[in-house]
């Protein structure tokens, strides 16, 4: 199993760069950031500093969206970083939650996400595409490579992943939900004539190593609220039908709106509705052996990478614990 770290690009950017360097030294192979450039600093500027400070870390957004940047700009930015640092980027992409909503945009349609993945990948790898009834190709790219990993929860999103994406990002570490979503992605890939095993599976969730579970729950409760934004969209679309497992939908019944100014932050007041059970299921907490046990269960389901959100009050200790006690047991 590979390991990644997910950070918000809060100022000062040098702290983000330092943590990414520490993560690589601890055995992490991927460095991800949020991509909402109103709520946080512009990540692609910081990626250049991260790549310069590390030797092999693969860097990218978790996740960008089709509506945040012009697609040609996105492709050229990835291609420039790859040319400078040797194909060490990856593009996580979704419909757009915080990046869209804080500027008054709705999430993109799945068809738009599909088209964006194709255009950005082709451009970043040097192929010609049709844009606005014009053939476009970036002429200076040589041997470019960019994988597109798509995030999603609902049946149609999972189908889009299986049919078109290079990787699948599940922002939730509940094994029951992982089993259902991974199965749906692989079924869609198989039906489309693709190799299901060729799609990289990444589970992303907060992780906090320690013994004080009540405190850890309070620090990680924000994640249930963040996931709840996407679940609320699913419930609006599918209702209480069996199209989406109840393990994912039942807990948002008490949800009452969401304030993006606290997005992804410990102590988010919009997440008081999230019960302890959901924090325990969606996140990894407790001492190191509990993390190893959950990760082994996810690995048995076919998870190729675990990326941990490191937004709590004991980041350095958790990072060190993963490097010394957890990663070695999953990569041996």
Where are the regions that the model predicts?
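N-terminal beta1-alpha1-beta2 module of alpha/beta enzyme domains
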Residues: 1-62, 146
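Alpha-helix-loop-beta-strand connector modules within alpha/beta enzyme cores
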Residues: 44-64, 68, 123, 190-191, ...
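Short, acidic/polar
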Residues: 11-23, 74-77, 150-163, 220, ...
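Hydrophobic faces of well-ordered beta-strands that scaffold small-molecule active sites
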Residues: 3-7, 31-33, 58-62, 89-93, ...
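An alpha-helical appendage that flanks or caps ligand/catalytic pockets
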Residues: 106-138, 183-184, 189-300, 332
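Acidic (Asp/Glu)-rich catalytic clusters
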Residues: 20-25, 47-58, 78-89, 162, ...
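Glycine-rich, proline-tolerant flexible connector loops at the mouths of alpha/beta enzymes
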Residues: 30-54, 65, 97, 172-175, ...
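Conserved, mostly hydrophobic/aromatic
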Residues: 23, 27, 50, 81, ...
């Amino acid at each position: 199993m590979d390991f990644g770290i997910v950070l918000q690009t809060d100022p000062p950017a040098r702290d983000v760069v330092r943590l990414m360097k520490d993560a690589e030294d601890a055995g992490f192979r991927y460095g991800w950031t949020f991509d909402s450039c109103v709520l946080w600093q512009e990540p692609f500027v910081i990626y250049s500093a991260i790549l310069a400070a590390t030797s092999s870390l693969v860097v990218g957004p978790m996740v960008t969206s089709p509506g945040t940047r012009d697609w040609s700009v996105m492709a050229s930015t990835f291609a420039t970083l790859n040319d400078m640092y040797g194909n060490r980027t990856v593009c996580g992409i979704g419909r757009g939650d915080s990046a869209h909503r804080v500027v008054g945009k709705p999430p993109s349609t799945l068809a738009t996400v599909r088209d964006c993945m194709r255009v950005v990948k082709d451009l970043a790898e040097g192929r010609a595409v049709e844009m606005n009834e014009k053939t476009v190709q970036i002429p200076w790219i040589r041997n470019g490579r960019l994988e597109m990993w798509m995030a999603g929860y609902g049946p149609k999103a999972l189908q889009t992943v299986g049919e078109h994406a290079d990787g699948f990002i599940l922002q939730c570490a509940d094994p029951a939900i992982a089993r259902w979503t991974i199965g749906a992605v692989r079924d869609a890939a198989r039906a489309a004539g693709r190799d299901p095993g060729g799609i990289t599976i990444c589970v992303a969730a907060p992780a906090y190593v320690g013994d004080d579970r009540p405190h850890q729950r309070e620090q990680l409760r924000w994640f249930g609220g963040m996931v709840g934004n996407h679940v609320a969209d699913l419930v609006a679309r599918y209702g209480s039908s069996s199209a989406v497992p109840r393990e994912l939908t039942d807990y948002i019944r008490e949800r009452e709106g969401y304030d993006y100014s606290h997005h992804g932050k410990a102590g988010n007041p919009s997440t008081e509705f999230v019960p302890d059970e959901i924090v325990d299921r969606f996140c990894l907490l407790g001492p190191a052996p509990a993390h190893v046990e959950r990760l082994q269960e996810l690995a048995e389901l076919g998870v190729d990478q675990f990326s941990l959100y490191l937004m709590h009050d004991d980041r350095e200790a958790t990072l060190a614990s993963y490097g010394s006690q957890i990663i070695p047991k999953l990569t041996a």
